[in-house]
């Protein structure tokens, strides 16, 4: 049995009122959701990459803890300590600053395991986020999953 039903949905786009079909509405919704998902994924990717960058600096500090403490103790100022860490270990300003703000308890063996676990998890998540950005099908799958979640609620 085939049913056709008229649907008139007037809306304003670019200061011009238009009447569109349900197919056009769904298409515009999907296009909008693609933009939202890509923007969200890029944001999450940038956030994760920043965190990985800091964790890599922590790892260098843990691997060279005695020398890091010596550099910090011998420095006359925070800036001197930061510059010396950057020069000695090839760190950038963000990593050096993070190491200087690091509480000593974060350098214990248990914390080292936590940092390595977080680093591994973030690297896996970064790989997944890059895969989403590289595949329109993955973006469409996310839209589908999110719509199914809404339906279940």
Residue locations for each model-derived region?
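C-terminal interaction appendages of subunits in large macromolecular complexes
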Residues: 1-153
